[in-house]
Structure formats: C-alpha cells, structure tokens
Design a protein with these regions (language model features):
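Surface-exposed strand-loop-strand hairpins of Gram-negative outer-membrane beta-barrel proteins
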Residues: 68-89
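Outer-membrane beta-barrel transmembrane domain signature
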Residues: 82, 99, 164-263, 270-275, ...
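Transmembrane beta-strand segments of Gram-negative outer membrane beta-barrel proteins
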Residues: 51-68, 102, 123, 265-267
Length: 288
C-alpha cells in the first residue's frame, strides 16, 4: 500500500511549465555546441581567407653569391675555374597556385664558363616539400649545347620535412642522368640512382640573425656528382665509393624587408671532408 504522502503528482499547469523550461535548456545547450556553419552565415573575411588558400601567387628575384656551392662542391671547378672565388648571378622566378608551384632558376658564373638552368615542379604543405626538377648545364660548352640534348640534362626528385621550423631533413635522388651508371663486375652497367641526404638545424639569435648548421653526405656511390680528388683536380670518371660526407656548413643569415621587398644576406663557411676543401661564401639577394 502506497501512502499518498509519499507520491507527489504535480498539477497539470506546473508539469507543462517545467517541461517547456527543460526543452528550452536543451535548445540552448545544443546551439552552443560546435557545428558546421551555414554557408550563408560566413563573413566576408572567412570567404577571403578560404580563397587565399587556393589562389595564384608569384615571387621573383636574384642572388649574388661569391661562389656557386652545391652539396659541398664548388661548381666553378666543373666549369674550369681554379680561383675558388667565382661571383655568380642566380635569378629565380616562382609561379604558384595554392600549395603547388613551378620555379625557374639559373646560374651564370663570372670567371668560369659554368652556367645552369633548372626547372622545378613542387608541392609544399606545412613542413613537407616535394619537388621534381630538371637540371640543364652545358659544362665546358659555354651553354651552347642544344636544350633537348639529353647528355646535358638530369632529373632529380627531392623530399624535405621541417620539424618545429628548426630541424630540416632533406633527401634527393637522381633518376635520369647520362653519366649516372656503375660498371658491374661482369662489365655491364646499372643505374646508380645517385643520392644525397642532409640534416640542417636553424637557431635564431634574438632578432639579429639565424644560425644554420648543415651536415650532408652521399649514402652510396654517386657517379655524376661525387668525384674523387687527385691533387688539385677532380676525377669525374672515378666517383668516390660508398658513403661519403661532403658538406659541413655553418651559415649566419638575416633577411631585411621593406614593404613587399626582401633583401636576404648570408655569410657561410663550408668544409668538404671528401675533397678536403674549405670555402667561405657571401651571398646577398633581392626578392619581391
């Protein structure tokens, strides 16, 4: 038997009121949750920011370098220069759409006859960057070799990843090159897939400049870019065997800006353990 004093049945009007209050509370709680915005509710700023992600962009400029260094090697030696100082003019033009870009880059050295023209196709997303590029250089030919002469081209793919805007890992492998072959014991040739990897760390020093330390090496025999040294000469017909460290660098850099124009300046030191060569490199540029 249930006593009436133990059970409370609200009057209809109170029950209806409490029910309406409960539904109102649920409605308020629901609207406070994170839900996808209605497209009609987007502000003009939101639309502009979304459009900026996939829009056309460009950059143009040039560097002036006291020498053209690549993977720890002085490229002027390939062009016949022996002064170890060969001022180089290096223009660049980049056209991009969103995270994809096409870049044209060139080098013309003052004292030697080394000239180069590179074409890049790249993708960059946050810390990841992937490129495929073609290098055209008429070494010793005063850049007169026909552009479609396959003996003057090589095709390379690279992948970079930067952690915390400080630590950068880089890997490059050449897939096509007329001289990138290793002769096997039976006299036949196989493609070497010459490669290069690099670890770089950048440390800002207050607002003064950035300090970058680089260590780079070839993981295995790289016929087309990693030669042996004989006296003061490089023997490109006899590549260095196996793993070799080729690039130990320390660079101080700073970028000055004025409106949309930037003026990067860097001073670096490079030591190549394989060739036992030391280099000082001064570079300045102009970009807009």
């Amino acid at each position: 038997m249930v006593h009436a004093s133990c059970v409370y049945v609200p009057a209809p009007q109170y029950f209806l009121a409490s029910t309406m209050i409960a539904f109102q509370a649920m409605a308020v709680e629901t609207t406070s949750c994170d839900v996808a915005p209605n497209p009609t509710d987007l502000t003009e700023t939101d639309v502009v920011e979304e459009d900026d992600v996939w829009s056309f962009w460009w950059e143009a400029g040039f560097d002036l370098a006291s020498n053209y260094m690549w993977r720890g090697f002085d490229q002027s030696y390939r062009g016949g220069n022996r002064t170890m100082v060969d001022p180089s003019f290096q223009p660049a033009l980049t056209l991009g759409y969103g995270e994809f870009y096409v870049r044209l880059w060139g080098n013309a050295s003052l004292f030697s006859d080394y000239k180069e023209f590179d074409m890049f196709l790249g993708f960059q997303h946050e810390g990841l960057e992937i490129t495929i590029y073609d290098v055209f250089c008429g070494v010793g030919q005063d850049f007169n070799a026909p552009f479609f002469d396959k003996s003057s081209h090589n095709l390379t793919a690279t992948i970079d990843y930067t952690f915390f805007d400080r630590l950068r890992l880089h890997w490059a492998t050449t897939f096509l090159h007329p001289n990138d072959f290793i002769v096997k014991a039976d006299g036949t040739e196989r493609r070497a897939f010459s490669s290069y990897f690099e670890i770089a760390y950048t440390q800002p020093v207050k607002d003064w400049f950035d300090v970058e330390v680089i260590a780079g090496a070839t993981p295995w025999t790289g016929p087309f870019w990693c030669p042996t040294r004989v006296g003061n000469e490089f023997d490109w017909d006899n590549p260095a065997k196996g793993f070799n460290v080729t690039n130990l660098s320390l660079t101080l850099s700073r970028e000055f800006t004025k409106g949309n124009v930037s003026f990067p300046v860097s001073l670096g030191y490079t030591y190549n353990p394989l060739s036992n060569q030391h280099y000082a490199l001064l570079t300045t540029g102009f970009y807009f």
